[in-house]
Every structure is written in C-alpha cells, then in structure tokens.
Amino acid sequence: TSAFMQAFTHNPTEPVYDDSDPDAGGYSRIKAMEYYNPVAIINERNMESKNDNYGANIRATLNILPIKGLKWENFVSYDKEQYETREYYTHYYPSLIGTNGQAYIENYQENDTQYESTLNYSNIFGKHSIQALLGYTYQYTYSTSASMTNSGFDFDDNQTHYIGTGTNLTEGKASMSSNKEDNTYIGFFGRFMYNYDDKYLLSASLRRDGSSRFGDNN
C-alpha cells in the first residue's frame, strides 16, 4: 500500500487523527472506503534491509616458449551476494488492523564462480599472418532463499526478533517457504584467421555450449 497514492487520492480536509477510534491507534479512517491513512502507513511499519556483496578476480597470462606468439590466459572470479529483509507492521497498520501485527523475514544468498582459459596464437611469416584462439569457459551459480510471515503478536515491541511467538504459527496459518537453485554452464570455442598480404582473408569459428538450464543432453 503506497502512502503517496493514499495521500494523493484522499480528501485533504480529512483529519489525520481520531482519538475516538482506539482500534486504529488514534488515526482517522473511513471504514466504508478502501482508504488507508497515509500517516499511519508510514508510522506503523518498520522496514530494514541489509545487503552485502563480495567479489574477487584473478587474471594471469603465460607466454609459452619456445613457440613464438603463443599465450595461455586464465581468468577466475568469485562473487557472493547476500541480503536480509525484515518488515514489521504494527497492530495499527491500516490495511492489517485485526491481525495483531505482522512480521516478515526473508534471506537470500547467491554464489557465482567463473573460470575462463584461452590459448592464443598470433604470428607473421612474410606475407602470411595467422591468428588462432581456443577457449574454455565455466560458470557455476548456487543460490538459496528462505522467508517467513507470521501474525498475532501480543505487543509490537519485539518487531521481527521473535517471529515465532505469533499465534498464526501455532494455528497453522503462518506462511514459510525456502528454495535452492544451482546452475552450471560450460562452453568451448575457437577461432582461426588467415591473412595473405592484407588482400585475402580466411576465417572460421566454432562454439559449443552446454547448460543445466537446457535440460538433458545439453
């Protein structure tokens, strides 16, 4: 529920507070309309999020002697992302009045590993120029997530820190979910280029990719 949209569409002369309605926490509300007090939307919820990202990569090149023009290049990278989201809506959050507070927690983590290796050859023999490339690439991604929503708290002080104390859990009404996903990608590729006297050019390339996302035999 957007506080901005509620403020934009509501009668500006409507009071913000109404002490005669304790169920709404002293906020003004119109029960017959799908209108939610924008001030209550802002004040009666707490949203926290934490996001951490880590990454590292290494690149190395080796000249392979005694073959002139032949190089072996390798690249390795690792990235990790994780975040946690916590949301709490008090007893007086407009669209949830009667649920006695609602808490939500979500955790997500993803790890991504990549490796690429290539052999590069480049040389000139008189009027002849040759360039060749052979490569291999690998990527593995692994992610997990979990979330939980619970309602029915005696008071709002604990927010999301004791999410298991809500009565919806004991009544079998709380929602929980978790997920795990991992994907692997592998690719082989090559390219060959021949140039004669900067007049004639011959080129060829190939590539073969496979991924766990593609299904069997791919």
Predicted region positions:
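A conserved hydrophobic secondary-structure block that centers on an alpha-helix together
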Residues: N51, L62-K71
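Structured alpha-helical segments in the cores of large, soluble enzyme domains
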Residues: I186-Y196
